[in-house]
Structures are given as structure tokens and as C-alpha cells.
Amino acid sequence: MSPSTETEMEDTKPSVVENGDQAVSRFAEFSKNELALDEKSCKEAMDLFGETKHLLMANVSSMGNGTIEEAERYWFAFILYSIKRLTQKNEESEKEEIENTGLTLCRILRAAKLNIADFFKELPQFVVKAGPILSNRFGSDWENKLEAKEMHANTIHLKILSKYYKRVFEEFFVSTDANVENESSVTGRVSECHRFGWLLFLALRVHAFSRFKDLVTCTNGLISIMAILIIHVPARFRNFNIQDSARFVKKSSKGVDLLASLCNIYNTSEDELRKTMEQANNLVADILKKTPCLASECETENLEDFDKDGLTYFKDLMEESSLASSLNILENDYDQMTRNKGELDERLFINEDDSLLASGSLSGGSSVSAGGVKRKYDLMMSPSKTIISPLSPQRSPASHANGIPGSTNSKIAATPVSTAMTTAKWLRTVISPLPSKPSQELERFLTSCDRDITSEVVRRAQIILQAIFPSSPLGDRCVTGSLQSANLMDNIWAEQRRLEAMKLYYRLLATMCRAEAQILGNNLTSLLTNERFHRCMLACSAELVLATHKTVTMLFPAVLERTGITAFDLSKVIESFIRYEESLPRELRRHLNSLEERLLESLVWEKGSSMYNSLAVARPALSAEINRLSMLAEPMPSLDEIAMHINFSCGGLPPVPSLPKPETLPAQNGDMRSPKRLCTENRNVLAERNSFTSPVKDRLLHLSNLKSKLLPPPLQSAFASPTKPNPGGGGETCAETGISVFFSKIVKLGAVRISGMVERLQLSQQTRENVYSLFQRILNQRTSLFFNRHIDQIILCCFYGVAKISQLNLTFREIIYNYRKQPQCKPQVFRSVFVDWSPARRNGGARHRTGQEHIDIISFYNEVFIPSVKPLLVELGPGGATVRSDQVPEANSKTDGHLVQNPGSPRISPFPSLPDMSPKKVSAAHNVYVSPLRSSKMDALISHSSKSYYACVGESTHAYQSPSKDLTAINNRLNSNRKVRGPLKFDDVDVGLVSDSMVANSLYLQNGSSASSSGAPLKSEQPDS
């Protein structure tokens, strides 16, 4: 391999000729002239900019379009946003706080000519680069004070809620978009009513909810506002008939039950809706000074044919004479409540044309949509289409999930809001009715241990769930008048979520005990007395509850931090959750699958992961490097320590000393090095939970039934001490078995991502084999390259290394450009790669640097990757031995210290056979599945013997016309009365439907039995809300 092959790469960084001092001058002018900052704030901003200007100059090319002008605008906004958020948290003088009034994020963005999507897309890079400086200036908890992730998630919530509100509003009232000239006065009034509803909703958020409330609660709030509008907006503006039996299905002799009908349409809880509507009514009375009266005592056209029991009516609330003044009052109230918080003005979301809501670009500034222009919603959801989205629409639309039954809207695809409400309904109807204590079956398992551990299990659940869903001190933030404390509402919310998580935990624990008993017998002492196992179960239960409600303030990995476990611990129970909870909605199954993928790609490799404790035992040759980098997990905090940090305001917990410390429990995890994630350095960069983005639709770990039909290894071995012999025999320790399973998952994930990039880059199958072989060898022989990094960083380098050694015409720029189009892409993957320049790791390309830092992926490739993997690359080159992956021996004796494969290592294997299709069942009534089709399978599927089983767009039975026409033809054939091969009787109710698992398994068997699903999703543009 020639030196030029090793390190000569295209330079993607333009030279920065701008002097840092000139940037300082421009920033000073921007702060004073554009934003009119007061002297104190301006000085603070100038000081922070001066400290970080070298970072700006070094990262110009990686921000926005790569020009100095745009990079400066981003950096100006980041600095001012940080100053506003972090200094106001430290202000003790109310006078000083008021002096800085008016510097909101909206003002900053407008002055910098940036939109919201682009700002939050680039902000993580600033957080990584400037993190140490911000920590020195504002304290180690600066990131919690900044609340950047919460603000971003909150922004996405508001975006989809505003679209949802507009759609629902227009289902009941005339459209606000009408352009007919003679209807301008009508649409003007309706538009005012529409704005009134949104302002009342924001008042509800400000006064009654937390600042960052979950999506389900906010949706309940919007539906309660809609109920108020329905009975107050003048009847002449209605777009519905009260006698519409398909819309208002809940009726009695007294008339239509409005709230029950709305709950039926939008899957909301009637109890929660009534409580929220009562809060909204109180707001109308207290803020707008309107006098409430019982609807049953009012005679008005608006209430005709409604059941008036339980409804409150305000005379003249929406009449023209008072509407304008009410709007002004609500506007002023919002200004007063939010004017000094430095946040976004949430009123702007009602105006879709606002420049701040303009579409941002995907993944670093380049448009990547191959199918046309993406909608604003898609781009607001995330700067990059990542895998971690609890807001992704369901694949199979519910019959009435997103519209009024029987109306034209009832068949459209599920939206983030309707999906959230459907999933919340599962939690409400399936989990909430369960008892909040162990069932009799579970108690039998708990009492059959060497000692009765029932009380320990109950107490642990209370402590851990109290830590995850803490109660706020009462009266901490009360509002004036008769309105309730927002923190009182938070406490009620937290108690409800604790109960849901506890009931789910007990339910799953009983199911898992039943399954483990089939393997180990009825005595499950070793598993049920394992502290880490229970905390993982509780964390996973809580995460499902949080994902169901789309909670903004508890973004993953918060549950790990609050329970004292790590990503590696949690990854051991995810598959069991999916396997054993059969009622789990598809959305939550997908959430767990994508969560596992996220754990594998980066979180498990972070500093402080318990994976390193096992790896040091399974791979002794790596222990020195693990210890040098301080990668080992710290001891898991005891329940006593966690309990000390909790305010047990609800009481009912036994005294703390009654429970022995985890270190003394008989079946603990050996050395108790079960971790608490203390490493905050860069922990949120590559693994940030952008929980509201479009997901990789079940690309990996797609369906649990695609995995081996053999019984999984007992859970107790997964949670046993790393040095303990594996009960399954074979002479392995539990650490070796665990690392072997973990590495096999990494290899499968790598195979899926490599395959996706190969197809996108249109490379040969031999190149795919070489990249995959190199990736496996690095994992097994240069494992430390993965430490503190994202596996995609290694994959991208593998592609370029193989391209150079194979003399392919492929630049790193092309690789990164195409990687941006991958659904899991995050810009930080190629912009910020961890490196350690200590003498033990220094090589010829390190330029005598010292310490640790984050560099771009090209620098990482040249200075770290190539010096380490050069011998492995040489083997793949035309001048080398060209070793095929299936010919590599299990043990390699090369002298790197990391090269010898250990018993815990997976064997280097040829590229696995991955299922090509990820079927989507498109109808609950018909056995019809739709799946993307790879060109490699086209010939086989449309051969003479099999083509009748498939309908392929453009290639089925006639020449390609267009997707629309081909799909129409397919639909016509499916819906025709012509009998196709007798057994396929879609309209016969007695014919059993083919299950999703049967389809998945058939694909699995066709494509081999050793891989997980890659399942490229069927591409479709998602709805706006």
C-alpha cells in the first residue's frame, strides 16, 4: 500500500482566510446593532465569543453551507442563546433579570437569518466543541440549564400539534384557507376563532401544564379546546351536522354527548379530557373575566341537540363584539408569562408561512430526497432521519385512528399525534386496569426463592420509579387566582406514570419468570435476587411509558442515569420485552427495536459502559487499554443512595435501612461493577435522542420472530458476574458468552448498514464482501478503534480504505454525501470523532498532539484509522493475499496485542444473507403485503413460475406506466371479482388471515437463517401532523 494510498485524500476543508479579530468585531456589531443588548449581556457574550472564536475558525466548513458568513451567523446565534439560557439561570437579582428582557430565541434567529430547523440541526456541534468552555464558565450542569434537547423536542411537538389542531379545526369549521372574495369576512372571523383556540391552548400550557409537557397531555388539551370552540363558535361557521351519526356516535335521550364523541374520534381519555376542560374553563373565567354558567341553564342555538350535563357555557365568548378584546388579553397574558425565558414564541406555530418555520435541509445542508421535495413536517421532525423516533407513524393505519369514522378522512395514514393517542389507549385499557402489586403467580415465584423477596421487589420498584418520575415540591410554582399549581399537576402526572410503569413491570416480570422457569425450573433465586436485572426491567418499563406519552423532559438515556445502569445492561432485556409482551403495540415494538439499534451503534461504546467490564474479562489483551482510557463502569449506586436523593412526599415507603445494600445480596453481580454513567463528556452527541424523528423502519432487529427459534440463553447468565462460569457449559465465562452475543449483534448491524451503503453507492458485491470482512476484522482484532466511537465512523472509514486499496474511483466526499441519505445519519458522526493523542496511542500522523479531542472523520482516517488497520487492508489488496472472509482462521497470531481472537469473539464469516423485504400489511381485511424490491431479487420474483404470486410496480404484467397507474391496476386486480387460484378468497370471512409473523418467517427462511432483517422500508411521504 503506497503512502499516497494511505493518506492522500481530497481536502474537504476550504482555507479560512478570515481573521478571528474581524469576526469578533462583526459579533460586537451584531449584538449591539441587531439585538440592542445591554452592556452587561454584551460583555458576557463578547467574552464567551472570544473564548470560542478559534473553534469557529476551525469548523467553518462543517456548518451550514461551509462559508464563513453562514458559519458566523450560526455561531453568533449559539453564543447568544447560551448566554441567555445560562446566565439567566444564575441571576439572583430580579432587576438584573428584567434588564435582559426581550432577548428571545426568536429574536436571535430572525437577526441571524436562521430558521428553527437549521438552528437545532447545527447546535449539537457547538455543544460538543464548546462544551469544555461552557462547563468552566457555567458549571458542570450547564447542559441541563441549556435545555437544548428539550427545546428542540418541544419545538417539534408544537409543530405537529399546530398542524393537528388546524386539521381538526377544519373538520368542524369552515376552512381558514378559503380564497373566495365574497367569503373573506367569514374566513377572517373563522381565522380569528382559530387563533383564539391556539392562544387558549398556549395559556393552558403556561398556567396548568409544565413548560415541556408530553404530547398526549397536550393533545388532550387541544381536544378540550376544540370542545369549547364547538359549543361557542357561532353555528353559522360550523362544518358539521349535529345529527351526523358517524361523527357523533355517543348519544342519549338528552342529546349528543360531546366529550364522549370526541374521545371516540381521537382516542383520548374521557376522564382526562373532562379534567383538562375544567382547567381550560377556569382559564377563561380567570384571564378573560368571563362568567361561567351551566350549559343546562342556557338557551342558545350553539347548544341545541347537545347533552348539556357537565358542560360550561360562557355567553358572548366568541361573538364579534368580544373576540378582538379576548385575543388581546390572551396575547398580553402570554407575553407576561414568557417574556424573560428566552424561549421560542409559541404563537408563531399558528402561522405556517413564518420564516422561522421554513424547511431546513437534511443532514448538513444538502437535500437528499430522491422522491421529490420533502414536506416541512419531515424536516422539522429532524435534521436527519434518525432511528429513534417514538413519533413515527404506524405502518398499518388504524381504521379510525386519524379521522372521523365514515368521513373522507378516516382512511388516511396514521400521524404522529394519532399514533401517540392510539398507543396511549393501549396503556390506558390494557395496563392501567392491572393491580399495582405482584400478581399471585409472580408472588409464587418470589416466595419460592431461597428466601421470600416479595417485599424487596416491591420496595425497589417504588424507589426506582420514584427516581425516574420524581414529584415536585408543592407550591413551588403557583399561579395567581384560582388556578392550580403547575407542580401539583406535575405530581399527579408523575404518580400516574409511576403506576403505569409499575404495573407493566410486574406484568412482564411474571411473564419472564414463567419463561425462565421452563429453562431453569421453578427456583429462580439467581435471577430474581439480581439487582441489575430488576433495574433494567424497571428502566425498560418506564421507557415504554415515557415513549407512549412522548415525554419531552425525560429524553433517553435519562432512565439509565436515574436507575444507575448502563446501555449494555439495558440491551440485555429489550428482546425479552418484545418477545414476552404480546399485546405491545407495534409502535412500541418499533421503539424498542430502534432503541436497541441505538444502544449498539454508540451508547454501549461510551466511556463508563459495563460492556468494558465484561470485555476486560473476555479479552484480557484489551484490559490495559480499557484501564488506560478509564472506560470501566463505576459501581452501581445502591438503593440507599438513590433513595437519599428522592423526596418521598407521598410516603408509604419502608425505612431505608430495612433493605440490605446491593453489595451484600447473595446473588449480586460478582464485583458489583455494575455502572452508573458518570461520563458526561460528549455522551449526548452521537446518541442524542432526537425522539421525534422519522425512524429507520424496523431495519435491524426488525421482528423478534426473525431470530432463532431455539430458546434464548437464560437471562440469569446474562446478568451473572462476568468472571462466573457460564451455566450453559463449554468452559466459557459469562463475560465471554455475553461479549460473543454482543459482537454478533454488532456484526449484524454492521452488515445491514454496509449493505445499504453498497446499494446506494452502486458498488460491486465483492466490494461489499471486502468492506464487511474489514469491519469484522477491526471488531475482532482492533477492537479499541470502537472505543468511545460510533460504529458508522468505522464503517465509513472501511469504505474509503477498501476503495483506495481496490483502486476504485470513490472519494470520501461521495461516501459522506451518500451517508447523509441513510436513515440513521447524524452529521456529528462524520464531524466529530473522538481521538486520544496520549503517547501510548501516538503514531506518525498524530502531529505530536496531546490529550483528547474530537476531530472530523477525514483527519481520523488519516491519523488514527490507517496507521492501525494498514496490515488488515493490505490483505484485501490486489498485491496481497486477498483473503476471503470465510477463509480467515479463527485465531490470528499477528503481534498487535489485539489480534488474537479470544473465545468470546465471533468467527469471521462471509457476508450474511439478509432478508430483502420488509413487508407492510396494508389491510386488516385482506392478505395483501407491500414491500420494496431490490433489483437483485427482481428476476427471481418475476420468473415464469413465480410471477403470479407477486405484483411488482412497472414489471408485473405490462410495461411500466407510472407508479400511480401501476398501483391502480394492482388494486383493480385485487378488488376484482375474478377468482384467482381458488384458495385466495379475500372476501371470504371464514378464510384465516396469514399472520405478519408467517410472512416474516417465510422471507427469513428464503434468505437464510443467520441474519436479522434489513428490511428497507417502503418509502412514502408522511402526512403533516
Swiss-Prot record:
Keywords: Cell cycle, Nucleus, Repressor, Transcription, Transcription regulation
Subcellular location field: Nucleus
Keyword Transcription (UniProt): yes
Disulfide bridge partners, by residue number: none
Gene Ontology terms describing biological process: cell differentiation; negative regulation of G1/S transition of mitotic cell cycle; regulation of transcription by RNA polymerase II
Residue segments, region Pocket: 415-871
Sequence segments annotated as region (Domain B): 737-871
Region (Disordered): 388-411, 885-912, 1006-1025
Protein family: Belongs to the retinoblastoma protein (RB) family.
PANTHER family: RE32990P-RELATED (PTHR13742:SF17), RETINOBLASTOMA-ASSOCIATED PROTEIN RB -RELATED (PTHR13742)
Function: Regulator of biological processes that recruits a histone deacetylase to control gene transcription. May play a role in the entry into mitosis, negatively regulating the cell proliferation. Formation of stable complexes with geminiviridae replication-associated proteins may create a cellular environment which favors viral DNA replication.
Protein's name in the database: Retinoblastoma-related protein
UniProt source species: Medicago sativa (Alfalfa)
Recorded name of the encoding gene: RBR
